[in-house]
Amino acid sequence: MNNAIRARVAEIPADFLKQVRTEGRDALGQQVKRVIAEGGEPCRDVLRRANKGEELTLASFSPFQKPGPYHEYGPVFVLANESTETIDRTAVPAGEDGNYLQQRFAIRAYSENEEILDAALVEPDAAQETVDRFFARTDTAFLHVRFPSYGCFACRLDRS
């Protein structure tokens, strides 16, 4: 795992995954979109890129729990069916083609009240330093990593 970000990676909520897979509804109650992977789509539930031909679900998701100005919804890809893959929740692979985060991505720091404190657009080789700097702030409760081109939520990082 070249340039892996070391932090505790939060799982996407099981109730969200169950809802999109069994009911076909996303976090906003909208019908999800089923797609066949072209290959390379970021699969949020398994923290890897999709393989060509895999069945995926595209659904609206919010990584926030509290109401407020930063509570937003956005698209995420998840595998259409439950996976038995083992997922490393202690690091996120970044940097090389095929890795979940690949190249440049955004990291945002949030308070306990889910208000944004800081943000940075980083290359994989600077990611760990940015994560460490954001977590050095005592008011940082968690971080979000996002794909900058489409703005999609990649993952939530908590203190190890």
Please describe what each predicted stretch is:
Residues V20-A120, P124:
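Conserved mixed alpha/beta catalytic, RNA-binding, or beta-rich assembly cores of soluble enzyme
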Residues F147-C152:
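Short Gly/Ser/Thr- and Asp/Glu-enriched loop/turn motifs at secondary-structure junctions
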